[in-house]
Structure formats: structure tokens, C-alpha cells
């Protein structure tokens, strides 16, 4: 088995954005108050209208992914323990969402921050929908998948983003590019790997000690972890 070519996943735009998740991204601890809820509801309408979710994926074996430099670090290897292959996934909301976030923030910082939080929540919804499609595919093959594991988790470096994008041909197939600083554009995009196994497998949950966000993580400031929500 080699890498590629990637294949598209059909994603339906959800009827609404998960406002509870958006409130958490917004920094509303313990849930949104009335003013925050109203702001999120107001900003959600144009944000959702601007979204054009797209996703691509492929299946590859460990040797091919290792040769391509994608399986860098120890934690992603632990995540794939017991797996015979892996799926690469990329999901993006499209450039319209980035543009809407910028528009919302002109003269209204709070609306810009709220729109950014809504974009993050919607990107996660799109990734969850894509993962659900892949789980259905795996079930038809009699296979099982781990959870999603993204660059920046544990010691899996953001430096693999260009490699994932190249393997998935995201620029051509989804309009998703990676900058010289390993940042994705459009910004509201997610890449991930999922292990494929012949038996149920959970994958590896990285500890906070290796996470690239450990010094500025809002969850850690509250004495909890992202795995608890």
C-alpha cells in the first residue's frame, strides 16, 4: 500500500453551530451568560452562511507514512499501536469563514472573537461529521478506528502539516494550503490521523506535558484537561 491518491468526503453543512462549544472557545467558563449567548447567536448566522465545508482522506500503511516523514515523534506511534494502517484526514470550512471573521471584527472586537470561536466550533463539527463517515467506511470493511489525532497533540510536531497537505493534495482537492510557518489557510481547518485495526482500539491520549499548548492552555488554568470536556 502506498500513499494516495486522496478521496473526497461529502459533508453536509449542519443546520446550526454548537453554541455551547463555541462558548467554551470564547472563554465563557461555566457556560455563556445572556449577553454572550446573544452575541454568539447573532454572529453564528453569517458565519454559518459563509461556510463551505470540504474534506479529503486517504488510507496508507505505516511504512509509507514513515518514509514520508509523517510519523515523527513518539506519541503518534503510540496512538497507532496495534493498527495495521492509518487514515489521513483534512477538513476545511473554506475561505469564506476567514473572511466573515475579519468582517465581524471590524469595529467590534467582541464580535470578531465570537466569530472566531464559532468558526472553531464549526470546524470541529465538520471534523466529527467526517470522522463519522470514515467510521462507517471502516465498519463496512470489518475494521475499527482510533480517535482523531492532530499535529500539535503530544510531541507530534506542527512541522508535519506540509507533509500531510502534500500527501492529501489538499491545495488542489480542498483549497487548503500550509504556510511556511506550518499554519493552515483557510485557518478554520483540521488535519488528523486515525489508526485502522482489525480489533477495537482506542489509541493514545497524549499527556499535557508534551502538548504544544501547555503554557497557554485555558483548560490547565482551570485545573482540568481537554479530555475531560
Regions found by a protein language model. Give the residues of each.
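Short cysteine/histidine-rich metal-coordination sites, predominantly Zn2+-binding motifs
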Residues: 224-229
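Conserved active-site and cofactor/substrate-binding residues in soluble primary-metabolism enzymes
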Residues: 35-38, 42, 121, 125, ...
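Generic secondary-structure signature for well-ordered alpha-helical cores
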Residues: 45-52, 135, 139, 169, ...
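Metal/cofactor-centered catalytic core regions of large enzymes
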Residues: 34, 74-78, 210, 215-216, ...
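Active-site helix-to-loop segments that bind/position phosphate- or nucleotide-bearing substrates
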Residues: 1-112
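Conserved mixed alpha/beta catalytic, RNA-binding, or beta-rich assembly cores of soluble enzyme
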Residues: 83-147
